[in-house]
Amino acid sequence: MNPPEICIIGDNCVDLYPQQEKKYAGGNAVNTAVAVKRNGIECGYLGIVGNDENGKRIIDALQKEAIDCQRLRQQEGNTAWTKVLLDEGDRIFIEDSLEVQKEWDLEEQDYLYLDKFNWVHHTIFSN
């Protein structure tokens, strides 16, 4: 494995599609990390999830893509979620909650972790 090139910092959530009774790992930063990795660039993800089923879903999705998650923190509480409706193929975001991400902030160890990357990308929802 090559050394990681870029670290993606920020939001994650589970997208809930009640009409289809489906759940997907998502969020701007998670989606970006997956896209970067699928384009052949080694990357890491820095964020926070709850210790619930949805947090496990996010972790599993990132690990499945072989994204470095050593600074993905898990905290007591619920992972962020978004309810999404589909209307003729268009997504309509109707409700969301940040949950454990509300109070999340970088720690000293996070900054040390970031030193090993050539690039850092953060989303508007990175706190």
Give each language-model segment a name.
Residues 14-19, 23, 41-122:
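Conserved N-terminal subdomain of the carbohydrate kinase-like
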Residues 28-29, 79:
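Short glycine/serine/threonine-rich phosphate/pyrophosphate-binding segments
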Residues 8, 26, 74:
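Conserved strand-loop elements at the edges of beta-sheets that form or border functional pockets
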Residues 125:
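Flexible loop residues that form catalytic
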Residues 29-38:
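Histidine-anchored nucleotide/phosphate-binding helix
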